[in-house]
Amino acid sequence: MRPRWLAALTVLTTVAAGIAGCQPQPSPQTASSQQESQSTAARQSTPLDAMQDAKRAGDLQLAWSLSKPVLLAYPEDPKIITEVAQLAFENGLKHESADLLVEAVRANDHADFAYVQRAVIGLIAVGRMFDAIDLLNAALTRHPQQHPSRRMLFGFLRGAGNNNAAVSHARRLILDRQIEFEFLLALGDAGEHKLETDSMQQMVARFPADQRPLMAVAKTLVDQTEYAAAESMLQSIVKQHPEYLPAQMLLGRVLVERGSWAALETWSQELSGDYESDWSYWLVLGDWAYERAEVAMAVRAYAESIQRNPDVLQGWTKLNVALNELSAIDAASYEGLGWDNSVQDWIEDRVRRLATLEQLREQFNPQRPDAVIQIVEIASTLRELGRLWEAEAWAAIGMTLPNGSKDRLAETRASILRLLRKDTPWQSLAKQPVLNLGLSNLPAPSFLKHVDRDAAHSHVAKVQNDEAFAVSATPKLSDVAGNVGLTFFGRTRDDLDKPGIPLYATLGCGGGTLDYDLDGWPDLMLMAAGGTPPQLDSQPNALFRNIGGRFIDMTQTSDAVDTGFGQGVAVGDINEDGFPDVLLLNYGVNRVLANQGDGTFRDISDELFTDRKSQWSTSGAIADLDLDGLADMMVVNYCDGFDAVTQLCEQPQTGLSRSCAPTHFPAAADVVYKSNPQGKLVDVTSKWQSTPSMLGRGLGIVVGALDAADGTDVLVANDMTYNHFYDFTATDPPQFSESASLRGLAGDARGNPQGSMGIAVADFDQDQKVDLYVTNFEQEYNTYYQQRSNHTWIDTTAKRNLTQQSLPLVGFGSQAIDFDNDGQQELIVTNGHIDFPPPDTKLDYYQPLQIFRLRSANQFESVALPEQDSYGASLHAGRALWTLDFDRDGQRDVVITHQTEPVALLKNETGTRHHWIAVQLRGTRDSRDAIGSVIQIRHGDQQQTAALTAGDGYLCSNERASWFGLADGSLPIELQVSWPDGSQQTHSLDQYDCHWLIVQAQSATRLPKSRSGEGD
């Protein structure tokens, strides 16, 4: 739905340009005609008559020369001033004409909107947009009820990127009962909307003396993460207009995103005006303080920001994370706040409701048949946020819609009206204690001059000095699937190469690695679909046995057949017998295949689950979540029910039936299963309080020791809803509570939920803390979460140079992998759209494989793959991606599934002589798989950390081992294992280029190439 203000701005700019381009030019006058005109003028009794006669005679120059006495004679007559303005315009004096039209408005005391509108058009015609804004402000000062002027001013301010000012006028229009959807949708989005850049560029082309309209272009560049270009443009704006706070505030934000801290400090010293009243100033100040590890100061700054604008989601999310970190690292300061113990619960509730509101507003369309239901949800959410006038306005305009029953909406409106009084403020403080936080016990934030940023104040780890940084070798990958017997094409439909793919068929099919026969060679389980969920009519999945680097289909022989609508695979020892079992995730009924140890599997689903349901499951993990020594299970679910199988949604722009957005269907809750001593899996989701306040639409999962605390954590990547992070607390009853917003993992840097799918896990910056990389949908950069403290993360994607490359792509599976074993992890991402985009877009269904490597200690670069790499040089509709070392040469390989082509096995042929070790763990006191362990190694002056995980991202399971590239290597290798139960053990390894088995409380064992030791 295109906002009316945007359309009006475009039309107004075009109309003004047309007027300017079609102005009549003064005609050359002959001497006789000039004499005749002058003679006629001399006979007139007034200057006005003389001017008008000259104009009628076609002598525009003479008429203009006679206009000054007219203006002196009629200084308060708006009609005559307008006539002179028209004369100036016809003489090509466009700026003079605009000035006179403004004078006519003043002469009319701004009372008649027709004069105001005419003057605005004149000013726009010469590019003086901000003079038009000043004029409209003046008109509203004199006549606050001049609603057409306020509407026009709202549009100009919104178009120029000054959302703070635009929102104030939208609120006034709503309070004056001038309720329109575009005003309601403008509220509370902190400027996160599409801007009309062409019109703004036309303004500057017409009037280069005012660069402020380019704010719209700069804002668009920021939205596209083109921070360098945005900074350059904003610098030119503030150089010309240092007092223009919207540009200054956006510049501050850009400097934060770029990590230009010295420039930010200079920026702060050059600010003038009432900048401290702007919420975004305090947000920038909070980011600066947080980067410097001044956490208490950051909390104060973020709190100051939300007090100035409590509707900005990112202010609340950042306050939430900073407050959580303060409680962990500075208990005295946290307790000294004097805040209620439940303050973080209040903040999380505010975050949840604001996030819900943003999603509801984004999905809203008054043309939808369920628009009234949408409005009920929006109005109810606003009521809970204390924004009662806004809530009532939504309900009121909803009552005017032609379709849908209004009974529930009428009840909702009545409940809101009962709370409203004439003196009710826009943001009610009733039942909103979080809006009254006392800040006096927090340090007053202020920018200080800190040019020397020592290590104590920097959370950007240095692997080594940039000057000495050795860039990893360019990976060489070859698809050898067909050469080694891996021929399989698991797909969701047969027509995935044609437009109109329904949502249920867009996710693809995944797979996983397991050594089911314990011969040391990793085997593969691959999923398939193609039928109709939840029926058992799909193509069967496949189990490929790896014999010395070649694969043989053992599906039928091993009794591993399932014909459900396959999605993902989870691998783990669910019954603790030493053999890896398999969880098959389906859109329908999930299945657990128990490894019998004799080369066959048995479906134990009915005897294992106490309650088994049909659901849309995507990914899962098998791991001991409560540290009782028994493997548990977590199942990630997507949308609830089966409507997605039959429903398509018509696209308003094209009228074509396409895949519905996931948010068109209800979200499904993830399920946590606990193993009991009787060998059953019991659903403990409710008992462990594991249902989050806002359900997600889960696609990816990783389970492991993701933070520094003992125990196992879970990250779930959700599509178009906030990600979830769970950690177990051994209370009575136990709690497996969700805390992604507290940890900084719920959304991106601005607090927005994204279309999250794949997850890569590694200590990329080698600070001995786990970092995370989450893939997202197009125009949502893949997010790099750097672990900042022992239990919080921060989005540093822009600082890592990882935003631009992923914006135009749809990222699915991703993994961290050290291709050349130099000790530094790279990133690999498979991309592909969910459907064929409309023909008038620049998007592609088939998209490139991407690999990123560190080009310096802190920044990544995209790797251009060699032309001889036929797979990397071509485009694909990739889906799941996971790792293994299928030929056991010490270089990890990659498996990728696709929508329109068979599975690919990318053999890692990167030329290197670097050394390596692979470490496998076996628990004795802990669960046998030992998920949640952390391995640290030291060799020479190098130190590396790896968390042993399950789930492994999008629809997949990696080979269960931890790889360490050693570069040139040095012996001995000091290895320390931190087990899930908190115990530690150390070993000194005397060989590399081999697999090591570490059994809990036993000596390390070097494994021969023929066996992995999984059954030992």
Label the model's feature ranges.
Residues 508-518, 566-580, 594, 616-627, ...:
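Beta-propeller blade termini
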Residues 48-49, 79-83, 113-118, 148-155, ...:
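Alpha-solenoid helical repeat scaffolds
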Residues 477, 521-528, 577-586, 633-637, ...:
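Hydrophobic beta-strand segments that make up the repeating blades of beta-propeller
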Residues 376-378, 394, 689, 801-804, ...:
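Gly/Ser/Thr/Pro-enriched helix-cap/hinge segments flanking short amphipathic alpha-helices
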Residues 373-374, 486-510, 537, 558-570, ...:
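Repeat-based blade/solenoid architectures
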Residues 56, 90-91, 125-126, 159-160, ...:
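Register position in tetratricopeptide repeats
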Residues 75, 109-110, 144, 175-178, ...:
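Short coil turns that delineate tetratricopeptide repeat
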